[in-house]
Amino acid sequence: MVSTWSGMMTEVPARIVAIGRTASDRALLRRALGELDARHRLSSKIAAEPNLASIMTEFVTRLTDAFGSLSAIRGQAVLDIACGSSSSRSPVTGRQTSEFESWMCRLLVELGAHPVGIDIGDLAGEAFEHHRVDLGVPGALDFLASGSFDAIHESRLFGSPEFRAAHGSATERIRREIRRQERRLLRPGGVLIHSDGQPHG
C-alpha cells in the first residue's frame, strides 16, 4: 500500500517530483517516493531531519543526469559504494541519523533497477543485494565480477570525517584502489556517478 504524504510535507515531494523531466518520470517518482514513505517512513524522517530532502533531491538529480530519464534506470545494475546503513551515526553528534541510511539503493529498487549496496554498516533487512565490506582492506571488492555494472555511484565517501578518522593516511591508497575497481567493474559504456554529482562515462 502506498502511503500519502502528511499535509505539512506536501511541498517536499512536489519539489523532488518536479525534477523529473517528463510526465512519465514525474509519475514514476511520485510512486517511488510513496513506496519509500510506506516502507521506510521517509516523510517523518524528513520532518525530523530536513537535510534528508536535499539528499533525496541530489540523488534524483544525479540519476536523471546520468541516465537521461528515470525510466531508463529500470533493469540497470547499479553498484552503490558506501551506500549507508540504518546503523550509521552522525560524525558530529555521534547519534544515529536517517541521513546516512541507504536511500540511493532504496530509491533504485523503487525505480526498477538492481542495486548492489556496499557498506561497512549493517544492511540486514534491506530489499536489495548488499554486502558488508571494509573498503580499507586491499582487494575488498575483488569478489564482484568484472564488467557487471551499468553504473557505479559513490557519494561523499572520501570527505567523510568517519572514513578519514578510521583510515587516516591510508585514505589516498584506498581512493586509488576504489577507482581501479570501478574501472574493472563497470561495463563498457557504463557511467560513474561521483560525489560531485556529475556523471562520468
Predicted regions located by residue number:
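A short acidic, Gly/Pro-enriched loop at the edge of an enzyme's catalytic core
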Residues: 139-152
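A short glycine-rich, Lys/Arg-flanked "PGG" loop and its adjoining helix->strand segment in the class I
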Residues: 168-188
